[in-house]
A protein has these predicted regions:
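Glycine-rich nucleotide phosphate-binding loop and flanking beta-alpha elements
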Residues: 52-53, 89-91, 147, 171
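Beta-strand-turn-beta hairpins that frame and shape the catalytic cleft
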Residues: 132-135, 192-197
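N-terminal beta1-alpha1 cap of cysteine-dependent amidohydrolase-like domains
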Residues: 1-85, 93-99, 105-111, 118, ...
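Glycine-rich phosphate-binding loops of nucleotide-dependent enzymes
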Residues: 200-204
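A structural signal for short hydrophobic beta-strand segments in well-ordered beta-sheet cores
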Residues: 117, 189-190
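Short Gly/Pro-enriched loop/turn and capping motifs at secondary-structure junctions
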Residues: 170, 205-207
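Pocket-forming structural segment of enzyme catalytic cores
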Residues: 97-184
Length: 231
């Protein structure tokens, strides 16, 4: 079972629930941020996009103090998979579960578009349904999605193979034009060192049906589901 965490201001929580339960036939439950424990039998945690607490102070800064985040941290420490998309990525960084930070987009405007992403590695539990070098197309919608980290942190991310997704051209080429927000290294998605926590700015939950944005999001969400079913 997957736990979809709901914060005040979340707006993609139901989309995530729909993608995982209705489209992929997984079992999901909504968990309010004031809860102090995850439901029994939780196999994965999903932190959705939106504007938790209205993005006051910094995106994710207040949400990371919610009671449920203590349980999320304990779950991650035990090796449980945690996925944060968009605002969920920001929350994971603020909570110290992922390195780096998400800053204002380099052009200082909100971006809403489809982007191409290059898969940098095939690994459980987030990319077992795809291959290294594969190109995914997913939507983005954010104003603070510029991934930033110190030079030392960036070096460690690359050295440890923690970069899972990069913004790219359709042919996989990395370019300034294909980077929608100025993220360092064109980084779109990063893992923790252990590989069980992933944050990404694009929205896989909005790309699970051919009639509505394509199905490339299944490569990520389906990989999580495969892990849960085999556990």
């Amino acid at each position: 079972m997957f736990a979809v965490i709901q914060f005040p201001g979340s707006c993609d929580d139901r989309d995530m629930w729909f993608a995982m339960s209705s489209v992929l036939a997984g079992k999901c439950s909504m968990v309010w941020h004031q809860e102090s424990e995850l439901p029994a039998g939780t196999k994965g945690v999903l932190l959705p996009g939106g504007f938790s607490y209205g993005d006051y102070l910094r995106c994710g800064a207040m949400a990371q103090l919610s009671p449920i985040m203590g349980a999320v941290k304990r779950f991650a420490k035990r090796g449980g998979p945690v996925l944060g998309t968009c605002n969920g990525f920001q929350i994971l960084c603020e909570a110290g579960l992922l390195p780096g930070a998400l800053r204002r987009n380099s052009q200082l405007v909100f971006v809403c578009d489809d982007v191409h992403l290059r898969v940098e590695k095939r690994a459980e539990p987030f990319s077992s349904r795809t291959e290294k070098g594969a190109i995914l197309t997913l939507p983005i919608k954010h104003g603070e999605g510029c991934f930033y980290a110190s030079e030392m942190e960036l070096g460690l991310l690359e050295q440890n193979g923690q970069v899972l997704l990069r913004y790219c051209e359709l042919d996989g080429t990395i370019s300034k034009a294909s980077n929608p927000n100025g993220s360092l290294g064109s980084i779109a998605g990063v893992l923790n060192k252990e590989g069980n926590v992933l944050g990404l700015m694009p929205h896989p939950e909005h790309a699970v049906e051919a009639a509505f944005g394509g199905t490339d999001g299944i490569a990520i969400l389906g990989s999580l589901l495969d892990m849960a079913r085999s556990a």
